[in-house]
UniProtKB/Swiss-Prot annotation:
Family listed: Belongs to the RNA polymerase beta chain family.
Protein's name according to its UniProt entry: DNA-directed RNA polymerase subunit beta
The UniProt record lists the keyword Transferase: yes
Annotated function: DNA-dependent RNA polymerase catalyzes the transcription of DNA into RNA using the four ribonucleoside triphosphates as substrates.
Xref: PROSITE patterns: RNA_POL_BETA
Keyword set, alphabetical order: DNA-directed RNA polymerase, Nucleotidyltransferase, Transcription, Transferase
Gene responsible for this protein: rpoB
Length: 1342
């Protein structure tokens, strides 16, 4: 049952069959949680600012006599609040203050003797703060930091898919990726030698790195190979027999066991032979000496008598060598066990091409590769190698990297050091060799277990650390210089590098983006966006198909539908609805536990890696009343594949059918009936919908509308329950419920609303209250609607009555025919607010001045300006009008004697200033709704600035006074009830002044204390009010902090009302987009037998080939929903009984849907029912959740209940002839959006204007006031017509024949309409370019 007060006003009928196990999570948590983690001091020091400080501090001087230690940090209060920052164009940030301790050690005394300790708090720059809605205000504009999907640190094994070598041989490689530090790659070449690369440089044999780690040849061989032991006995050679090793080999001699020949010479050894040998239990067999020749020695063999090396490790044995061994008294020797199949001799081969023999040579070789051209020294080489992978300052795998590294190498524990160890490198090589030997598989780098999310907090921390490292260098320098006794921590730290790093990240990083603020959905989607681009990510050009493609692990984590079209497709994704990141940054999605075929309500979040181990059923599996899976075979997913399994084998089940898709896709009703390409366009176009003048909830929704509207932060949501005490257009006051009060608090919540402000996309942000005085509200109730919301539900467009039929070719190729009624009723009218600013600077020739005294400008042009030269609020302006008058000093020109004389007589003339006023751009018209004036400190404010200041002060005082009065009333109300409860009569109190109430004395000691507490609260409130007002006053009065050289900034805000017109782009939610071709008079539109005309006529041919059938179902369901509303409306007009209305509503809400979501009308009070009925008269809102929506039968039932034809088709009549069309037409209600591609912004014309410098052709594009390009194809068209003279004119005088242009102008002035075409400038450019190639080319006249 619906419980919130707002929802009761208009209950959406839900067709969903599955009950909701998990509430939709808070949609912005990925941003807010990540940044909170960054700012909160983590006692472990594992993440956030704390981690950055701990990783850089303590900083020790080079000599070790001083150390700067980090103690703690705190964030101060921001100077301005979010709104003030946006108006003033500054960053919303807080100062960071860090407590540092400088410890000085005594040089002479024993090491570690402390001489002096100084502790001090140091300012370390400003940290931008996140607003409550997950955005940052940087230089006055709202920005979003998009999360990044990057390759997780760890170790990855891969191959080149046979592309590197011409033979098509698959070459395997391994790569160790740290969180920061050098990459380490191992790779095979076509000859099966193993190489190593550091940071993708020149490759070296892989054994070099082992030698650098102090391995000898013998140790390398015993680490990587199994050995075969041979024994020399009585002149015979006996081999240790390990039967398993012989499988698949061909016997080169008879293998004898117990006198029987088990395998004859030349036969392949099979599993049967091996079983016989194992049965015989032989441990050694005799082999011919030739069998041993050519095997590789595993050890160095040194002659005990002479001490000389007889056989080096990794050399092939010869007959002579074996004889020598025997002579020298060696009874046993070992060789490497290799074979072609699964024990390759790769390391042994690699050792042969490795020129280094000891550690130093290996280090020098690595040094030469990393620093070519520098002479290596022993220390430098050792230092370099040490710093590459074994120094915590330069290399960090991070906890994630270590976890991934250890789990890939199948180690039991997942924690360890952030640097590499000797074992790590050896294990990676072993694993790579095992993969090359066919014992393991390569990784899939597009698997979401190998890609992790880096969110705001983590990226900010990395940037902060970069700044700190820069500071560390400077501190070390300072510590080694000069007198340490006089130095304070403050003197050591320069906050500039830190501020610069942080500022650069928030201001200009690729992932810090200008927020898409078209509507609430575009905001929420932008904050939930996951990009694979950006620093440390992919680039558009290099990303192949695999990275962009949908991967099985995307299920429930990233949306398979919502991604941009074009070059970024698949690189920018959107989080799925229920998805979240785990502690390591991998995406998880929730599943319900299934035990023995019974579904429980226990929910587990699984990451992509964990998910692979389980069998997971879909959310729409059939379930009986006991929550037991019904079917014998159930479709499910296991290890990334879809299969069928028995109920008992199933371990988990999806939480909800919509967990696959993102927020935008989950707002498309009947998504399951749309083709994926169109769904992609649908989810992208919803983000471009412009908020209409009056928001209209969708009749056919999906049930996600409320979550989006509330979570996006455009609505005002109650923080606590209570009763509405006061409402006007700009504030709502709630009297809080007694049980939700904090001790000693006034119990009043005041919500201020945003009025007519500009969004990033120039749309209008305005909040309207949707509650009235006396209404009860609960925590989380919507109190005021924002842009594109209607009663707390997302409302991006309008419900339009549409007909699918051709209409005189006006809906050819997706064009849309719209009725004039839509324009008259302002259904698709939008308000756009533009900000124009005028800056007065201090120039070399003197200051610019804002004034109404502008040279050579008539009275008419100044009519809209006040005496300060600034336009009035409320003035209606059009292109070319002056908004702010400004004059700029001109350079002194040489005056003629005559002018000097005139000057002397008439005083200064206005010739030394030029007009540089702010004018309205061409093609823009609108009303001035606000003017802001910012004046630099120390510059006198003009009259207008003072007026603005006075108004702000008045408003601030009024706001605070009202706020104070409300809170004061609350305090007196409590005092009054306390006094009345203690025997004071109403009359007695009404005679006393209110302030005297607080001075009364009561008999009850406890009550007296309570009254005194109330009196104290009143005093505190008064002081708080005075303090707040003073702070506000100071902020308003003080000069503004403007950029250097700027004296004044005037910002003018224009509101433009845009009605719908031909050329505007509209769309439905199913990717069905089109451009308006004609606004048709109402009387010409097709109408039904009741005389109701349709609003929009769409082309039926737009449906079959696009395969977005969802729009047809939406239209049918919309017709039914509207029909129910009309029926309720008729019942109200006929003044039917409330009981009858209740009964009808109950029938409507009971139709279809699940038992869990039933709505019991009987539980609503009469007033509630009246409100509900009033809100349903325009149509019954229905929800058809994604993949769990209304069935065809249910739509038909609802149509029947609404007295509409079940086919959804009706006979229409031609508005012009009055004749019926020859067959029935599908008519219904579709939710249509007006997209932010308005013809007003695109239409553009030019006659003359600026020209390109080199080619002298007109510029292109509206922004440059360019011309229309007469391109190659247009030239062909004129050629085809044989219109030679027209063509000549187009390519010469109308384009870039400079002399021809000026001559033609002169001719026209003289009244002679002839033209003389000359040589186009671009031809001259071509000549010059050919000459630049050294070819002389000249035009000779005949």
């Amino acid at each position: 049952m619906v419980n919130s007060y707002t929802e009761k006003k208009r209950i959406r009928k839900d067709f969903g069959k599955r009950d909701q196990v998990l509430e939709t999570p808070y949609l912005l948590s990925i941003q807010l949680d990540s940044f909170k983690q960054f700012l909160d001091a983590d006692p472990e020091g594992a993440y956030g600012l704390e981690a950055a400080f701990r990783s850089v501090f303590p900083i020790t001087s080079y000599s070790g006599t001083a150390e700067l230690q980090y103690v703690s940090y705190r964030l101060g209060e921001p100077v301005f609040d979010v709104k003030e920052c946006q108006i003033r164009g500054v960053t919303y940030s807080a100062p960071l203050r860090v407590k540092l301790r400088l410890v000085l050690f005594d040089k002479e005394a024993a090491a570690g003797t402390v001489k002096e300790i100084k502790e001090q708090e140091v300012y370390m720059g400003e940290i931008p703060l996140m607003t409550d809605n997950g955005t940052f205000v940087i230089n006055g504009t709202e920005r979003v930091i998009v999360s990044q999907l990057h390759r997780s640190p760890g170790v990855f094994f891969d191959h080149d898919k046979g592309k590197t070598h011409s033979s098509g041989k698959v070459l395997y490689n391994a790569r160790v990726i740290p969180y920061r530090g050098s990459w380490l790659d191992f790779e095979f070449d076509a000859k099966d030698n193993l190489f190593v690369r550091i940071d993708r440089r020149r490759k070296l044999p892989a054994t070099i790195i082992l030698r650098a780690l102090e391995f000898t040849t013998e140790e390398i061989l015993t680490t990587f190979f199994e050995t075969i032991k041979f024994e020399i006995k009585d002149g015979k050679v006996l081999m240790e027999l390990v039967p398993e090793r012989l499988r698949g080999e061909t016997a080169t001699f008879d293998i004898v066991a117990g006198g029987d020949v088990v395998v004859e010479k030349g036969r392949r050894i099979t599993a049967r032979h091996i079983r016989q040998l194992e049965k015989a239990g032989i441990s050694q067999i005799e082999v011919p000496v030739e069998y041993v020749v050519g095997k590789i020695s595993a050890r160095d063999y040194v002659n005990p008598q002479t001490g000389e090396v007889m056989i080096n490790a990794n050399t092939a044995l010869s007959l002579e060598a074996i004889a020598n061994l025997s002579q020298a008294g060696f009874k046993q020797f070992e060789v490497l066990f290799t074979n072609e199949l699964d024990h390759g001799s790769y390391i042994s081969e690699t050792l042969r091409i490795d020129s280094s023999t000891n550690r130093l040579e290996a280090l020098v070789e690595i040094y030469r590769m990393m620093r070519p051209g520098e002479p290596p020294t022993k220390d430098a080489a050792e230092q370099l190698f040490e710093n590459l992978f074994f120094s915590a300052d330069r290399y960090d795998l991070s906890t994630v990297g270590r976890m991934k590294f250890n789990s890939r190498l199948a180690r039991p524990d997942h924690i360890g050091s952030g640097i590499l160890s000797q074992d790590d490198i050896v294990d990676v090589m072993k694993q790579l060799i095992a993969i090359r030997n066919g014992k393991d598989d390569v990784d899939d780098i597009d698997h979401l277990g190998n890609r992790r999310i880096r969110s705001v907090g983590e990226m900010a921390e990395n940037q902060f650390r970069v700044g700190l490292v820069r500071v560390e260098r400077a501190v070390k320098e300072r510590l080694s210089l000069g007198d340490l006794d006089a130095i304070q921590p403050q003197d050591l730290i320069n906050a500039k590098p830190i501020s610069a790093a942080v500022k650069e990240f928030f201001g200009s990083s690729q992932l810090s983006q200008f927020m898409d603020q078209n509507n609430p959905l575009s905001e929420i989607t932008h904050k939930r966006r996951i990009s694979a681009l950006g620093p440390g990510g992919l680039t558009r050009e290099r990303a192949g198909f695999e990275v962009r493609d949908v991967h099985p692990t995307h299920y429930g984590r990233l949306c398979p539908i919502e991604t941009p079209e074009g070059p970024n497709i698949g690189l920018i994704n959107s989080l799925a609805v229920y998805s979240r990141t785990n502690e390591y940054g991998f995406l998880e999605t929730p599943y319900r536990k299934v035990i023995d075929g019974v579904i429980t309500d226990e929910v587990d979040y699984l990451s992509a890696i964990e998910e692979g181990n389980f069998v997971i059923a879909q959310a729409n599996a059939n379930v009986d009343a006991d929550a037991r899976l019904k079917d014998e075979l159930i479709p499910c997913r296991h290890k990334g594949e879809s299969t069928f399994m028995n109920a008992e084998q199933i371990q988990y089940m999806d939480v909800s059918p919509q967990q696959v898709v993102s927020v935008a896709a989950s707002l498309i009703p009947f998504l399951e009936h749309d083709d994926a390409n169109r769904a992609l366009m649908g989810s992208n176009m919803q983000r471009q919908a412009v908020p209409t003048l009056r928001a209209d909830k969708p009749l056919v929704g999906t049930g996600m509308e409320r979550a989006v509207a509330v979570d996006s932060g455009v609505t005002v949501v109650a923080k606590r329950g209570g009763t509405i005490d006061y409402v006007d257009a700009s504030r709502i006051v709630v009297k809080v419920n007694e049980d939700e009060l904090l001790p000693g608090e006034a119990g009043i919540d005041i919500y201020n609303l945003t009025k007519y402000t500009r969004s990033n996309q120039n749309t209008c942000i305005n909040q309207r209250p949707c509650v009235s005085v006396g209404e009860p509200v609960m925590l989380g109730d919507v109190l005021a609607d924002g842009p594109s919301t209607d009663l707390g539900e997302l409302a991006l467009g309008q419900n339009m009555r549409v007909a699918f039929m051709p209409w005189n070719g006006y809906n050819f190729e997706d064009s849309i025919l719209v009725s004039e009624r839509v324009v008259q009723e302002d259904r698709l009218t939008t308000i756009h607010i533009q900000e124009l600013s005028c800056i007065a600077r201090d120039t070399k020739l003197g200051p610019e001045e804002i004034t109404a005294d502008i040279p050579n400008v008539g009275e008419a042009a100044l009519s809209k300006l006040d005496e300060s030269g600034i336009v009035y609020v409320g003035a209606e302006v059009k292109g070319g009008d002056i908004l702010v008058g400004k004059v700029t000093p001109k350079g002194e020109t040489q005056l003629t004697p005559e002018e000097k004389l005139l000057r002397a007589i008439f005083g200064e003339k206005a010739s030394d200033v030029k007009d540089s006023s702010l004018r309205v751009p061409n093609g823009v018209y609108g009303t001035v709704i606000d003017v802001q004036v910012f004046t630099r400190d120390g510059v006198e404010k003009d009259k207008r600035a003072k007026e603005v200041e006075d108004m702000q002060l008045r408003d601030a005082k009024k706001d605070l006074t009202e706020e104070f009065k409300i809170l004061e009333d609350g305090i007196f109300g409590r005092a009054r009830s306390l006094l009345i409860a203690n025997g004071f009569g109403e009359d007695r109190l009404s005679k006393l002044d209110r302030k005297r109430w607080l001075e009364q004395s009561l008999d009850d000691e406890g009550k007296q204390v309570e009254l005194e507490q109330i009196a104290e609260q009143h005093i505190a409130l008064k002081e708080e009010f005075d303090r707040k007002f003073e702070a506000k006053r100071q902020k308003i009065i003080q000069g503004d902090d403007l950029a250097p050289g700027v004296l004044k900034i005037v910002k003018v805000y224009l509101a433009v009302k845009r009605r719908i017109q031909p050329g505007d782009k509209m769309a439905g939610r199913h990717g069905n987009k089109g451009v308006i071709s004609k606004i048709c008079p109402v009387e010409d539109m097709p109408y039904d037998d009741e005389g109701n005309p349709v609003d929009i006529v769409l082309n039926p041919l737009g449906v079959p080939s696009r395969m977005n059938i969802g729009q047809i179902l939406e239209v049918h369901l919309g017709l039914a929903a509207k029909g129910i509303g009309e029926k309720i409306d008729r019942m109200v007009k006929e003044q039917r009984e409330l009981a009858e209305l209740r009964e009808f509503l109950q029938r409507v809400y009971d139709l279809g849907g699940s038992d869990q979501q039933q709505i019991d009308i009987a539980t609503l009070s009469d007033d509630d029912v009246r409100t509900l009925v009033q809100n349903l008269r325009k149509g019954l809102p229905v929800a058809t959740p994604v993949f769990d929506g209304a069935k065809e039968s249910e739509i038909k039932e609802l149509l029947k209940l609404a007295d509409k034809p079940e086919s959804g088709q009706i006979t229409l009549f031609d508005g012009r002839t009055g004749m019926p069309f020859e067959r029935v037409v599908t008519v219904g209600y579709m939710y249509m959006l007006k997209l932010n591609h308005l013809v007003d912004d695109k239409m553009h014309a030019r006659s003359t204007g600026s020209y390109s410098l080199v080619t002298q052709q007109p510029l292109g594009g509206k922004a440059q006031f360019g011309g229309q390009r007469f391109g190659e194809m247009e030239v062909w068209a004129l050629e085809a017509y044989g219109a030679a003279y027209t063509l000549q004119e187009m390519l010469t005088v109308k384009s870039d024949d400079v002399n021809g242009r000026t001559k033609m102008y002169k001719n026209i002035v003289d009244g002679d309409h002839r033209m003389e075409p000359g040589i186009p400038e671009s031809f001259n450019v071509l000549l010059k370019e050919i000459r630049s190639l050294g070819i002389n080319i000249e035009l000779e006249e005949e």
